[in-house]
Amino acid sequence: KNMAEVANHFAEQGYRVLVPDLRSHGQSEGDSIGMGAWDSEDIVEWSKYILKQDSSASIALYGVSMGASTVMMASGNEQLPDAVKVAVEDCGYTSAWDEFSFQLDDLFGLPSFPALDAANLVTKLRAGYDLKDADALAAVKRKKVPMLFIHGDADDFVPTDMVYPLYKAAAGEKELMIVKGAGHGKSREADPLAYWEKVDTFLEKYI
C-alpha cells in the first residue's frame, strides 16, 4: 500500500512495475527484519526472475528508507544482472549499524557499546546476519550502477548527513537531490513536481 502511489506513477510513465514485499513485510514470509542484508539478495533474484519473463528487459530499482538501503546493497552485489541499468534511493541509511547507533544516541543518549554490540549478537543468533553486513556504503563502491540519491534536509530519523558519504562513495554516474523541508520519507510530498521531474529525467537517461 505504501508504494501504490509510486507504482502508479511509474505505470503511467509506461514502465511495467514489480512491487515485492521485503522479508517479514506485507505478505512475505519471515519473522526477522533483515535491514537489507538478506532483502538485497532477494532483489537480485527478482531481477533474474524479470529477465526470465523478458530477456530484453532493462530494469530500474527504486526504494525508500530501508527499501532504499536494500536497493543500494543490491546495486553492489556481483550477481546483480547487467540488465539493471539504474537505481533511485530515497532516504536510505549508510548501514544498519550506523542507523541503530544514531537512534541509540538520539533517543536515549547511549553509545553504541555495549547495547548495540549485544543487540548484534542476538541478531546473529536469531536472524542469522550481522548488522555490519547490512552496509549500503560499502555496496555503492563496488558496482557502477547509475544512482540518484534523494534525501530531505529535515530528516531526523535517517539523518541527512548520511546521504553525503553515500553519494561521494558511489562508483557509477550519480546525482544528488536534497529536498528542502522534507522529513523522513516525505520528499515526494514536500515537492512532488520537482521530485518526479528529477526521478523521471534520471531514469530516462539510462532506460
Question: What annotation goes with each model-predicted range?
Answer:
Residues 182-196:
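Catalytic histidine-centered segment of alpha/beta-hydrolase-like enzymes
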